[in-house]
Amino acid sequence: MKKHRRALALVSCLFLCSLVWLPSWRVCCKESSSASASSYYSQDDNCALENEDVQFQKKDEREGPINAESLGKSGSNLPISPKEHKLKDDSIVDVQNTESKKLSPPVVETLPTVDLHEESSNAVVDSETVENISSSSTSEITPISKLDEIEKSGTIPIAKPSETEQSETDCDVGEALDASAPIEQPSFVSPPDSLVGQHIENVSSSHGKGKITKSEFESKVSASEQGGGDPKSALNASDNLKNESSDYTKPGDIDPTSVASPKDPEDIPTFDEWKKKVMEVEKEKSQSMHASSNGGSHATKKVQKNRNNYASVECGAKILAANPEAKSTSAILIENMDLYMLNPCSTKIWFVIELCEPIQVKQLDIANYELFSSTPKDFLVSISDRYPTNKWIKLGTFHGRDERNVQSFPLDEQMYAKYVKMFIKYIKVELLSHFGSEHFCPLSLIRVFGTSMVEEYEEIADSQYHSERQELFDEDYDYPLDYNTGEDKSSKNLLGSATNAILNMVNIAANILGAKTEDLTEGNKSISENATATAAPKMPESTPVSTPVPSPEYVTTEVHTHDMEPSTPDTPKESPIVQLVQEEEEEASPSTVTLLGSGEQEDESSPWFESETQIFCSELTTICCISSFSEYIYKWCSVRVALYRQRSRTALSKGKDYLVLAQPPLLLPAESVDVSVLQPLSGELENTNIEREAETVVLGDLSSSMHQDDLVNHTVDAVELEPSHSQTLSQSLLLDITPEINPLPKIEVSESVEYEAGHIPSPVIPQESSVEIDNETEQKSESFSSIEKPSITYETNKVNELMDNIIKEDVNSMQIFTKLSETIVPPINTATVPDNEDGEAKMNIADTAKQTLISVVDSSSLPEVKEEEQSPEDALLRGLQRTATDFYAELQNSTDLGYANGNLVHGSNQKESVFMRLNNRIKALEVNMSLSGRYLEELSQRYRKQMEEMQKAFNKTIVKLQNTSRIAEEQDQRQTEAIQLLQAQLTNMTQLVSNLSATVAELKREVSDRQSYLVISLVLCVVLGLMLCMQRCRNTSQFDGDYISKLPKSNQYPSPKRCFSSYDDMNLKRRTSFPLMRSKSLQLTGKEVDPNDLYIVEPLKFSPEKKKKRCKYKIEKIETIKPEEPLHPIANGDIKGRKPFTNQRDFSNMGEVYHSSYKGPPSEGSSETSSQSEESYFCGISACTSLCNGQSQKTKTEKRALKRRRSKVQDQGKLIKTLIQTKSGSLPSLHDIIKGNKEITVGTFGVTAVSGHI
């Protein structure tokens, strides 16, 4: 069992040893990563290749950091073979392929971090580098992902997309290898990321494939500068590139915003927008200076007006027609006080004058120098541009004074502005009433002042145009006020806006002529004494555009501001005026009404006049503008003038009724009412028997019937001229009414309605109110608290019917106009008395008028009412005196009201002078061209600035691009050099790898062989040891048994000379069981020794020195007993005498002689030393010379063991128990030895030493 267990243990040990000494693991595996390596590679070849790659990589990394200069030198010194060139080309091609194809998932290779700045910078590979590589520890191998590309391309580097993309930034900036980032250090298969990127950039730039933009370049530069790795880990050449590129990049940084087209701080506006802004600014400037400029121009115009008399015989004027009773009609055209035209006062006096040239009427002068005659009191003036005609336009009713000198009637600029554009050549004058009761009514002189076409052009061009030009001259352009209002809607081209510009110029002229009411009206103040005050509700202004406008004769309506007696329009057929007009060849009243309406309607239809009307309206904020009636605007102006005058006055007599024409919202208060006008009105009322309501003041009873009779008489006289007279009265009355209306809060719409009706041909409706004005004014002065509406009845139904028709026709237009008037003209009010039938429709208009009038005339109302208490005659006288100073401003206002019908305006628009049209067009074009030129100049300046800025930016961009290109070229050149150097290094590395592969294969083979030999030797040793162990076990067991059984018998043996004690025997027995130490041999001569003598070999213990060193076998030497005769050594180590043992009986049982296992000093291979080492420890009796020579031959086993002891040095110093075996199987007893029965051989007893002779 023991043998089997030992054999099993040995076999297991052998198996373990074979596993531990497996050759492949010792060659390919790292101690710490053997498992991982085995998982990646299943073949020894892959492991070997990996080992080679890693070793080569380390070598390459050691040689990595090379200075730019050293790189250049080494690169130039390196020999490049054609194969290397081919490798370079292949690497470039591969890089291009990777750049274009962009390999899908990038393969990351993790390699151990190695300092690139280690030693060994030699580029040439020598044998030492190979040895170093081969001797590098194999335990530093790390797992690397295996790429198919490596096997395919061999040693050509493969650039992966991730590496190329990541390294583009470094390439752009000139950044080189970054080994700190790096815990990814490339092997020879995948070069460093930055180098790969540089290589790619170099290749792509050489082929013109670089697509990176400047902004990306800068961003990458900044990113790379911020996130740059350790500079120590980069190549010096790449660092130099980076530094240079950064130096160039910093001064040449291109700001993307700066490269872009510079934005103008303010976008260039379009021409229309720019023009609007400019016009608004200039309008504000011009408005502040407009009043002063208008004042100066107005004064000059006045002078010019009075300069030329166009009704003079000297310039060619003549009388075209007159009433049949007239005598010496041409005398009025001659400046001679002794000549006059004579007419009886009982006849209707009229005449027609042809002026020497078409003019714009500005002033009329009339004179009667004859002492005993009646002077003209009221006369009606009509104008026309052609003759004969039935479309006489009523210029107005003029109220003269009872004087014997020239009386001037200047036309108010504002009111007459409606006619500024109308050039007329024919004037018709009708005398309506006269002062005194003389039989004859002579007329000595009549003058007409105005402005011809040429003068108009000169006035505007010299005064207004130049003044405006001076104001705007600094800006090198001029334009009319409100020019932008027309331009906003005008066409965008220059020619398209010419029309609007011309209209705007016309508006300027109108403003200049009529805008300054406050300054000039003071001198032109005149109180109209006509009883008919035209209370024009604001509404009728719009009607003329759509409906025919009758002549101003028929438009007038009567209104009493205090009495407020409703005036009903008399039909033109019934009115005597109409009949008188019919009698006249020039105009028939009924036909005049219809023709005027149609003619005016036709004229109004023309867009030209409508546009002009809009122009005039634009400047007057208090006026409701009707598109085709510019005269309405001027009526409003005249009303404002009258209001200012009334405020300036301290007291005005208001004992008069006020008639309001159905004109635009102009209110003309007539403080002095002509009795003649009132009389025909009352007369008509009585004749017609029509009931009429009028507002009256309750404070006092109506004036005495005498006043009414007087008024009636006057009205009867004036009935014939009433239609035209009513217009004039209405204007004058409106001027006077406004101050008085304030005290009278109640004003009814009837007047306004009537006024509107008046637009439709309605003869003198307002005359009724004039009849009652005197009484009412007196009553007003007494008490203002209450107002009543006394009614006066007219018995004629026709008048009521006519009013109804008129109202129906005009209600719509009235409503429209009222709205306009309410919104536009608050200050002006129309005092109208509603008829019973028409009261409701008229109330709305009247209410609005009341509010405006009350607000305007609060201050002047009280004193004016007091004056109205006076008799109408006194009022008329005051009015005359006042008109003398004021040049009959009210009369002028009344004339303007007459034009308010719209007929005059229309004709005037048509008759605008050709010069003015051309002038306006020219001015408009000049303004347009000026604005265009200015705009273009500004535009060109902006464009030039932008171009300059763009040029500067472009130059900067070019410079920066040049710098960038230069930097790129330098960088590219350096990268090319670096790439060439790297390619050379790559070629060398390839060679090294091939050499290393061969060397590694050879080493692997050698190591495998060596390991195989070691394993075989180990097996043999184990087998031999096993055999020896088995043999020893067997021999030891046998020897022990025999020896123990025989030893007690031989303990006691007789000695002839000496007896050994039991102790000595025990010692001897014990000593013999162990090998004997070598000692000096005891020489016994045969002569001295008898056979019977006993020689005792004494153990070392008997010697005190040897006794202490029982166990130190190596140091002691065994003394051999030498016989007297010399011994001959035998090859086997047995010592034999000269004579062999003859006694076969003795020692016959000893089959083998074992020598001590102790070896003396090493003397391997010599037979002498072996024989000496095998010296016997016992020697026989001296007599037996061959006592120690009778050893038997050694067996083969003993010889083999002897050889093994020689070969193994580690077994020295160990005591091996020898198995002593004899042929007999037992040791010779002492007795036998003594007797010499048996032969004792060396090694039979293990005695350490023999001490001397016994």
Curated annotation (Swiss-Prot):
Gene3D superfamilies assigned: Galactose-binding domain-like
Extent of Polar residues compositional bias = 288-297
Keyword Endoplasmic reticulum listed: yes
Keyword check for Transferase, yes or no. Answer: no
According to UniProt, the tissues expressing it are described as: Highly expressed in pancreas and testis and to a lower extent in prostate, ovary, heart, thymus, small intestine and spleen.
Coiled-coil intervals, chain numbering: 909-1009
Which N-terminal residues, if any, form the signal peptide?
A: 1-29
Any one cellular-component term (Gene Ontology): cytoplasm
Specify where it is mainly localized.
endoplasmic reticulum
Q: Which PROSITE patterns match?
A: SUN
Query: Which GO biological-process labels does this protein carry?
Result: ossification; positive regulation of collagen biosynthetic process; positive regulation of osteoblast differentiation; regulation of bone remodeling
Transmembrane intervals:
1011-1031
Where does this polypeptide localize?
A: Rough endoplasmic reticulum membrane
Q: Any idea which UniProt keywords this protein has?
A: Coiled coil, Developmental protein, Endoplasmic reticulum, Glycoprotein, Membrane, Osteogenesis, Phosphoprotein, Signal, Transmembrane, Transmembrane helix
- What superkingdom heads the lineage? Eukaryota
Q: How does the record describe the protein's post-translational processing?
A: O-glycosylated. O-mannosylated by POMT1 and POMT2 and elongated by POMGNT1.
Span of domain SUN: 284-453
Task: Provide the residue span(s) of the region labelled Disordered.
Answer: 58-88, 118-270, 282-304, 530-553, 583-605, 759-788, 1152-1172
Residues of this chain annotated as glycosylated in UniProt: N202, N236, N524, N928, N955
Compositional bias (Acidic residues) at which positions? 165-175
**Start-end of Basic and acidic residues biased regions:** 241-253
Please name the Pfam families in this protein's record. Answer: Sad1_UNC
> Where do Low complexity bias regions lie?
130-145, 540-553, 1163-1172
In-chain residues carrying the UniProt-annotated modification Phosphoserine: S1081
Provide the function of this protein: Required for bone modeling during late embryogenesis. Regulates type I collagen synthesis in osteoblasts during their postnatal maturation.
Protein name, please? SUN domain-containing ossification factor
Task: Write the lineage as a comma-separated list.
Answer: Eukaryota, Metazoa, Chordata, Craniata, Vertebrata
